[in-house]
Amino acid sequence: MSVIFHENPGTSLGSVVPDTNTSFERESQLSVKTSPEWIDELFPNVSFIDSPTHQVIRGFCRDVFVYRLPGGFRVRYWDAVILVPNILFLLFLILKCGSVIRKLRTGNSPVLRAFTLLVYVSTLVNIIRCAYSMTLSMTDGLEQTVDQTLWIIIKFFYLTAEFCALTFGLLFGHLDNGKSILIALLGTLLVSIPHTAVQVIIEMKIIDNSWLPLTYFDIQSDGGFLFWVFSSAVLALVYFFIMCLPLVCCQKYTKLPSKGSFLIYCMMMVVLNVLQSMGAALILFKSSDGLCFVGVSTYVYFVLYPPIIYFTFLRKKLKTPPNNTSGLFMYRKHKDEQGSGDLPDSYYPRFSGLTSPSYDDLFDYDRDARFTHYDISRNEYVQNPHYNTYSTPLIMTSVETAESTVTTRTGSDDYAHHRDSMLSEPSTGTTTRHLKGLGPQGSLVFEDDPSSLTSLRM
């Protein structure tokens, strides 16, 4: 998202233009009544081209940038329609401020803090820019320079927020402390600062262009639009490539967001940047139709981008209650105590059963099947007559894989055969054995086994 219109003093940079149609068309060389010859040649049989309706649409897209509110106010329509939604969203953020602060204090997520800061800062800077622009007469050179500077600042903040959102979204699993967040932020600044520097050079006319040929790279005429077309097209390709990442083999390098909201966010940014690039290209070739593409995409960008960030990355996270035990199930590669390096993944076990709702679900996973049998004569399941009179393992274990030290065999053929054999055996007179704990090498220790108790103490 770069300049809006290089001859529009209220939205970007350029010479001051009076609020009249004739002056605007003469200075900008964009006519709302006729289309360029290349459009007539491209669409020779389209009656909508240069029709009265088409001229009205072109005129509206042009007037909204420069016309001011009636009643003697110096406020432009463009500033007003951007300011009002941002103020409403800021009021919404203020109402949510208490819950946001509590969530940030109880949680330990630097990414959440970074996203929250991006939303609040972007909204405040946009409101300050709109409010200050309303007080400018735009006829004084100093005030015009201040307005230009504010537009560059707000676009710098928004571009930085874009790259931060992409970085945090794609590297969420790797950003677990403030240092990693700072490194990611510095990486985004390496892209946004050069982009803004080129904008400053073009819009402030810092470089003397007398030595440049009169081509599309002429800074005073079309250089800004060419840069706009190129930057918007590159951003659209970046977002489109990110949308295609789940289709390529890159899962081992980055943890891609699985939420559909992130893909919707990328899709919206692709559409906005494509519209920006198309609009700038049309204006570059002297077609006033580009003003409509530019106006719609720019308005959506400066009004809806902070809310999009909030509802995509923050809303669900801020609504969830703090969970102090979530750190127990966070994956973190263990370090060897002797300092020899990382331990292999198969060294430490993973107990998927720990996430079950109750303790019995882990250790007594097939209770009904073990203590009942099917009676053919009665055509129903009845309690086993040898209930609590036979010895049975508390849980089936397996060390066949390094994936876990405890592996249930629910539903397997071996377990079904073992269960049926136990149910068919007569009672041996043994009583229920109570589990005391785990002994060496994962063996089960029972209360009535003295040798096992001795090994447990060891």
UniProtKB/Swiss-Prot annotation:
The answer to whether the entry has keyword Ribonucleoprotein is: no
Q: Where the protein is mainly located, per its record?
A: membrane
Going by the UniProt record, its keywords in alphabetical order are: Glycoprotein, Membrane, Transmembrane, Transmembrane helix
Sugar attachment sites are N21, N45, N323, N324
Which Gene Ontology CC terms are recorded? plasma membrane
**Where, subcellularly, is it found?**
Membrane
How is the protein disposed in the membrane? Multi-pass membrane protein
Q: Which domain of life is it from?
A: Eukaryota
**Which Pfam families does the protein's record reference?**
Tmemb_40
Compositional bias of kind Basic and acidic residues: 411-422
**Gene Ontology terms for molecular function:** G protein-coupled receptor activity
Q: Write out the transmembrane intervals.
A: 81-101, 114-134, 152-172, 181-201, 225-245, 263-283, 291-311
User: Region labeled Disordered — which residues?
Assistant: 409-458
Q: What family does the Swiss-Prot or TrEMBL record give for this protein?
A: Belongs to the UPF0359 family.
Q: What's the protein here called?
A: Transmembrane protein adipocyte-associated 1 homolog
Organism classification, top ranks?
Eukaryota, Metazoa, Ecdysozoa, Nematoda, Chromadorea
